[in-house]
From Swiss-Prot:
Classification via Gene3D superfamilies: Endonuclease/exonuclease/phosphatase
Highest classification ranks of the organism: Eukaryota, Metazoa, Chordata, Craniata, Vertebrata
Compositionally skewed regions (Basic residues) per UniProt: 367-389
Gene responsible for this protein: Apex2
Protein name: DNA-(apurinic or apyrimidinic site) endonuclease 2
Ranges annotated as GRF-type zinc finger: 467-516
C-alpha cells in the first residue's frame, strides 16, 4: 500500500509550536514527530513560508526521510511547498516548478508539452512564487507490473477580489498546471495532483454556497469542471482526464471541509470549505485508490490534512535526485570556500581630535610599538634607579609641567548668572502668598472635565454590550477593509461562525463602538 498525505501547513514552524521544544526550528525531532503522526509514505506540504536563506538543518534534514523544497523567489516568508518522502519511497526524479524554467537538467522529470502560448518571462513569473514541486516514483501493481507515478505537489494562488491581476495570475497558473499534468499523462506516467487548489469545486464543498453570487460561474470552478470528470462519463475529447478521489469514493458526503476561518472560529462548528484535494488520472483512481480521507482532528493550521491510499507498492530509487535538500551545499557537509563569507565593508573615516590629549601623550602614542618594547627591555637590563613611592597629596597638586608642555587650551565654563544670596524664611513665605493670590481660579466646567477624565481612567473600560441573539458579552473588532470605515471599531457576537440554523452559532448583532 502507498499512503500519500497533503497538508497546507500555513508555515512549516506552525505545527511545531505545540511540541515540547523551546525553539521549534532547532529541535531535531520535532518535524519528524509531525511527519510520523501523519503516517504517510509521501507527505506534501504547502505554504511553508520559508526561503532558502532561513531554512535550518532540523527542518531540511529529517531522519528516515528525503526532502525537496521549492522556495518563493519573489517574497520572503511567503508561499513555498515541500515534499517529504520516506526512504522506502525515494523518488527517481524531482523537479521544481511546472514550466522547466528552473530545471537543472540533472535528475529532472521533463515532459512539458507545448507551452508556446506562454512567454519565457511569464513562465518565470508563474514559477517564481514556489508553488509547485514534482517527484517521480516507480510503483509496482498487484500484478507485478512496474509503472511510473508523478506527484505534483501544488499550492495554487488565491484570487484577491481587490486585486484583479491576481485572478489573471491564478487562471494562468491553472492553465500551466493542466498542460504539464496532461503532458506527463500523455508520456505514459500516472499522475496525482495534490495540494491546496484554492477553489471549492461544487456547492457541496462550500458551507454557504447559496449566498455567493454566480457560484458555478466562477472561473476557477469552470476550470475544475474541464479538468475533472465523473466515473460514469465516457472517454472523449471534452471529458476531463482526472478525477476527484474523495468525491469518487464519497460522492454525497456533506460538510467535508478542509479549511476554516480562524478569525471567526468557524472550525468549532465545521463551517468552512473544501479547498484541498487529491486528484488522479482516471485509470489510476478507478484501479488503485482504496481510500481517500480528511484529517480534521489534526490541528496546527487553518487547513487540515487530506490523503489517499493506493493499492500499489513503491519501488525506491537507489539514490536521491539532485534536488534533494541534503545535497544543498549548506547541508551537504562539504567545506565551503572562505570567499563566500567575506563581504567588503565600508570603513568609516577616522574622526580627528575626538578626544583632547596633551601633545606629549599624542607623540608617545605615535611612537612605534616595537621601539617602546625595545626601550622597556633596555631600562630593565640597565637596572636604573627605582621610582620612589609618591605622596598621596601629590595627586591633588596642580601640575606645572602639563601646562608648560601642552599646547591645548582648556575650555572655561561661562557664568550662568549673577550670584545671589539665599532668601530668608519670611521672604519665601511672602512669595508663596503672592503666588497663590495671582492664580486664576479654575472654572467649574474645567474641574468637571478633569474629574470625569480621571474617573474614566481609574474605573477601567466600559463593559461590553450584550448581543441580541444570546444576551452574551460581545467582542470588539476593527475594520481592516479599505474604505470609508477603515480603522473603525465595532461590536459583534463572540460565538463562532456557523450555519444560520444552528442556535449555538454567531448571531447577526452589530454595533459601532462610536457613532460616525
Amino acid at each position: 500500500m502507498l499512503r500519500v498525505v497533503s497538508w497546507n501547513i500555513n508555515g512549516i514552524r506552525s505545527p511545531l509550536q505545540g511540541l515540547a521544544c523551546q525553539e521549534p526550528s532547532s529541535c531535531p525531532t520535532a518535524l519528524r514527530r509531525v511527519l510520523d503522526e501523519l503516517d504517510a509514505d509521501i507527505v506534501c506540504l504547502q505554504e511553508t513560508k520559508v526561503t532558502r536563506d532561513v531554512l535550518t538543518e532540523p527542518l531540511a534534514i529529517v531522519e528516515g526521510y528525503n526532502s525537496y523544497f521549492s522556495f518563493s523567489r519573489s517574497r520572503s516568508g511567503y508561499s513555498g511547498v515541500a515534499t517529504f518522502c520516506k526512504d522506502s519511497a525515494t523518488p527517481v526524479a524531482a523537479e521544481e516548478g511546472l514550466s522547466g524554467v528552473f530545471a537543472t537538467l540533472n535528475g529532472d522529470i521533463g515532459c512539458y508539452g507545448n507551452m508556446d502560448e506562454f512567454t519565457q518571462e511569464e513562465l518565470r513569473v508563474l514559477d517564481s512564487e514556489g508553488r509547485a514541486l514534482l517527484t517521480q516514483h516507480k510503483i509496482r501493481t498487484l500484478e507485478g507490473k512496474e509503472k511510473t507515478l508523478t506527484l505534483i505537489n501544488v499550492y495554487c494562488p488565491h484570487a484577491d477580489p481587490g486585486k484583479p491581476e491576481r485572478l489573471t495570475f491564478k487562471m494562468r497558473f491553472y492553465r500551466l498546471l493542466q498542460m504539464r499534468a496532461e503532458a506527463l499523462l500523455a508520456a505514459g506516467s500516472h499522475v496525482i495532483i495534490l495540494g491546496d487548489l484554492n477553489t471549492a469545486h461544487r456547492p457541496i464543498d462550500h458551507c454557504d454556497a447559496s449566498s455567493l453570487e454566480c457560484f458555478e460561474e466562477d472561473p476557477g470552478r469552470k476550470w475544475m469542471d474541464g479538468l475533472l470528470s465523473n466515473p460514469g462519463d465516457e472517454a472523449g475529447p471534452h471529458i476531463g482526464l482526472f478525477m476527484d478521489s474523495y468525491r469518487y469514493l464519497h460522492p454525497k458526503q456533506q460538510r467535508a471541509f478542509t479549511c476554516w476561518s480562524v478569525v471567526s472560529g468557524a472550525r468549532h462548528l465545521n463551517y468552512g470549505s473544501r479547498l484541498d484535494y487529491v486528484l488522479g488520472d482516471r485509470a489510476l483512481v478507478i484501479d488503485t485508490f482504496q481510500a481517500s480521507f480528511l484529517l480534521p482532528e489534526v490541528m496546527g493550521s487553518d487547513h487540515c490534512p487530506v490523503g489517499a491510499v493506493l493499492n500499489v507498492s513503491c519501488v525506491p530509487a537507489k539514490q536521491c535526485p539532485a534536488l534533494c535538500t541534503r545535497f544543498l551545499p549548506e547541508f551537504a557537509g562539504t567545506q565551503l570556500k572562505i570567499l563566500r563569507f567575506l563581504v567588503p565593508l565600508e570603513q568609516e573615516p577616522v574622526r580627528e581630535q575626538q578626544v583632547l590629549q596633551p601633545s606629549h601623550q599624542i607623540q608617545a602614542q605615535r611612537q612605534p610599538r616595537k621601539a617602546c618594547m625595545h626601550s622597556t627591555r633596555l631600562r630593565k637590563s640597565q637596572g636604573g634607579p627605582k621610582r620612589k613611592q609618591k605622596n598621596l597629596m601629590s595627586y591633588f597638586q596642580p601640575s606645572s609641567s602639563l601646562s608648560q608642555t601642552s599646547g591645548v587650551e582648556l575650555p572655561t565654563l561661562p557664568l550662568v548668572g549673577p550670584l545671589t544670596t539665599p532668601k530668608t524664611a519670611e521672604e519665601v513665605a511672602t512669595a508663596t502668598v503672592l503666588e497663590e493670590k495671582n492664580k486664576v481660579p479654575e472654572s467649574k466646567d474645567e474641574k468637571g472635565e478633569r474629574t470625569a477624565f480621571w474617573k474614566s481612567m481609574l474605573s477601567g473600560p466600559s463593559p461590553m454590550p450584550l448581543c441580541g441573539g444570546h444576551r452574551e458579552p460581545c467582542v470588539m473588532r476593527t475594520v481592516k477593509k479599505t474604505g470609508p470605515n477603515f480603522g473603525r471599531q465595532f461590536y459583534m457576537c463572540a460565538r463562532p461562525r456557523g450555519p444560520p440554523s444552528d442556535p449555538s452559532s454567531r448571531c447577526n448583532f452589530f454595533l459601532w463602538s462610536r457613532p460616525s
